[in-house]
Amino acid sequence: DASGVAAKGATPSFYKNYDAIPSRGGMSALTMAGAVAGWSEALKISKEWQGGKEGLPLTTLLDTAISQANWGIEVTQSLTDASNKTFDDLAGDENFDQFLIKGKALKKGKILKLTALSKTLAHLAEKGLDDFYHGELAQNLAADLEAAGSPIRLEDFENYKAQRVPPLHVTTSK
C-alpha cells in the first residue's frame, strides 16, 4: 500500500480560518506522496521473487519516463478540460505555470513539456528512490510545499513508508 497519508500538520487548527479545506493551491496539498515508496517496495519484492538477484537498474527503468517527460506529452481532451476547469483558480500561481503552455490553458494536440518531472526522475535515477524521502530531493520538495502553504513538512517525508498488506479479494460469483 503506497497510498498517501495525511500530513502530521493537516489538523483542524491548521485550517482554522477556513470553512473547508481549500480545493486548490498549496493548502490543498495535504497528503504525502507514496508512489515512489511503492516503486521502491515493488523493486524489493521483485528481487525477493528472483531469489535475491538484482533486476534491471533503476536508470534503465526510469529512462523512458525521463525522456518522455523531457520531450513532452500530447495534450488530450480530458487534460484540456481539466486545464480549463482549474485555469481561473490557479492562473498567476507561479507553481501552476509549469502546467501551462505559454501562460495559457492547455489545448488538445499541443505538446506539454514536463521539464521538472524529467529532472526529478533523473535525480532519482542517479541518487536512488530513497532520496525522495530522505535526501536532497525530500528537503527541496518539503521547502517548496511549505512555501506554497501546504501542511506537509520534511518530517512527513522522513516518516513515510509503503506497507506490504494482503491484497483485497472478493468472491464475485459462486
Placement of each model-derived feature along the sequence:
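Noncatalytic scaffold domains of N-terminal-nucleophile
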Residues: 1-128, 132-134, 138-173
